[in-house]
């Protein structure tokens, strides 16, 4: 993988993480589970560690979070509320311990850790002045939080005054606000009784409760607080270990989790981690891992901090959760290219904070591999805590009335024959645009952001238009009028006019976007761009032979035949001509002559994760340099730019003796020629 590919991947990861940080920290409306965020963050961090020259000050790894919502007064934390680095395996935890051992001047034997469950709630800071609760704030972005003092005062297990005759002049207590399962269930039951919206999970309920502008509402929510550390402390001599500080907090009335333990050495820590995994279902509140801290405060100070996390602590996260449920039925869906996908209809089950009732079975081979039948008890896993998967079947529980899953021979939507081409795992409907399901998906693809980018025409509008037989081909979209659109559900005059304006704007596009929008099988964005740059106009592309098509970078025999066959079908030609007749146009494709450089006229393959520029930016740069960015390695390949976790392409390049360079090496060469 090239340095440019790595850079592009880093950029994409940063953009994705920033979006989810905004949803999580600013709106308190997370769109993905923590485990998926952790996976993305871990991937970005690993790439930046391997390529430190690509680290930028605004990377999510270099700060804690996002800015707080308006509506509450902002409070700047005197000491930043840092997050923790994560471990996802014993090996990563042991590597953390090794880093500590390497850094300490005098290594105690054994290393003692204060081990805690990682509560799945909201981090808060609570200030006591002369023993009286005076201020509380959310963590926010770690530097600035929101003033939630009035709401924190309503939480019953937080003392308004410390239980001591000799309180500190100032004391900052940090911890987690969460909602136990029992209270969460009662809250949702009451919401259902009153016809109100329920919360998806206890963390969302806690977040929504803490951020109520009316403290009376918060006071009716079953929130609980557990302390996990001391921040500012003035006018008091604190104990010399983290565990003893927690015990001191308990002694002055601050609640601390009852599962906190001292563990001597790595093996004991890992035993604690596994014991918390076993206890997790019966705790009565959500945890998503363990927090493991060097106990000695002096050692903590010696180890210090990196920009966003302490070196002396780590969160060892649990793997994705698995649950058992029953397969009630299997439905078969039809995709844009006619692919038939079996979808498992499950008895609803709560997995990792989300109710799961559907899961893909991928294809007929997967059904055979699992030996799955309707009525079976199946194991559901949310991969990365996001995508529901059936990972196993409890065949010993198969009921007597279990039914075999019969893959259809006719399309469930249009009745056309279903065929499976030799060498492909996917079976497909042969109905083409005669099939409403394929028509809908093809039209959704046509208007999508990366294709024609018609943002005023969404999936629901496409569904209505096809169902009411108002459109059959992409060109029909441009024949719609205001009156027709206003007759549709949820389409007032303003929405209808917005749709028409978007359609008019989309008429001015690029040849690459237009080719991609046509939905030719296996022609993605990169291939569409290569085709546009190579042939310069649609007539030349339409007239190209399979051999001429294979001269284009990233176009092999299979893809060339797909493109060639597409242009041999009269209905496709008619559809394209109709679009042109509706005013679709683009500027003539002009390729600037690249200056002399080592990549001009060469075929380059990208592999692995590019962190400095990202894959798409790297491909664009290669085209500017006069190179061809291909998708597979062959004897015709001149260079392979290898990023992190490069796989089979790198192996094949080494076998063929193709020159391999890193992303950093590639960029260094490019920069040298730019000078």
Curated annotation (Swiss-Prot):
Signal peptide: none annotated. The keyword NAD applies. DNA ligase that catalyzes the formation of phosphodiester linkages between 5'-phosphoryl and 3'-hydroxyl groups in double-stranded DNA using NAD as a coenzyme and as the energy source for the reaction. It is essential for DNA replication and repair of damaged DNA. It catalyses: NAD(+) + (deoxyribonucleotide)n-3'-hydroxyl + 5'-phospho-(deoxyribonucleotide)m = (deoxyribonucleotide)n+m + AMP + beta-nicotinamide D-nucleotide. GO terms for cellular component: cytosol. Its cofactor is Mg(2+); Mn(2+). Zn(2+) binds at residues 411, 414, 429, 435. One of its GO terms (biological process) is DNA repair. Residues 594-675 form the BRCT domain. CDD domains: BRCT_DNA_ligase_like, LIGANc. Belongs to the NAD-dependent DNA ligase family. LigA subfamily. This is DNA ligase.
